[in-house]
């Protein structure tokens, strides 16, 4: 999918979303979660305290990240660990964000999204002027959709089922087999921590 398709997909999934929610989406797609991480204990504690929306599903973002619902079945410690490991600065994040903003402006100016072009441009100008700070979901979005997720890098997706199995069963002895460059070392490193 391209940026236009990702934005349309967000609008289809959340038809009552506001411009602010799309800005959050493209921000997360570009920067990931680097702005949210402080330390492991704080991240884990926040996950444990957050209400869980049982209807959440994995959402692919327009970049290297996914929104993993808290209801997925991972322990708070595993999710916190994946979240922190995903919080590395993204290369060219600002440029990626600005490319996505141009696509968004085109969609709005072509009346493909239900936002005022003038108002959107004013909001985007102010956002840029402020240095593109991270956004929260709108109150409308929070009330209607109850978002409950953490961003993680999509390189961890192939291992999520295994992590869930380990988290929801007894400790396991695991043998990792596979072809060259299939992710054995990455998985072993993740499991060791």
Predicted regions and their residues:
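P-loop (Walker A) phosphate-binding loop of NTP-binding proteins
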Residues: 179
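Hydrophobic positions on the alpha1 helix immediately C-terminal to the Walker A/P-loop
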Residues: 187
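Conserved lysine of the Walker
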Residues: 184
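N-terminal pre-Walker A segment at the start of P-loop NTPase domains
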Residues: 144-169
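Long, basic/Gly/Ser/Thr-rich N-terminal segments
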Residues: 1-140
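Short hydrophobic/aromatic beta-strand immediately N-terminal to the Walker A/P-loop
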Residues: 173-175
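Post-Walker A helix-loop "phosphate-sensing" segment adjacent to the P-loop in P-loop NTPases
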Residues: 192-193
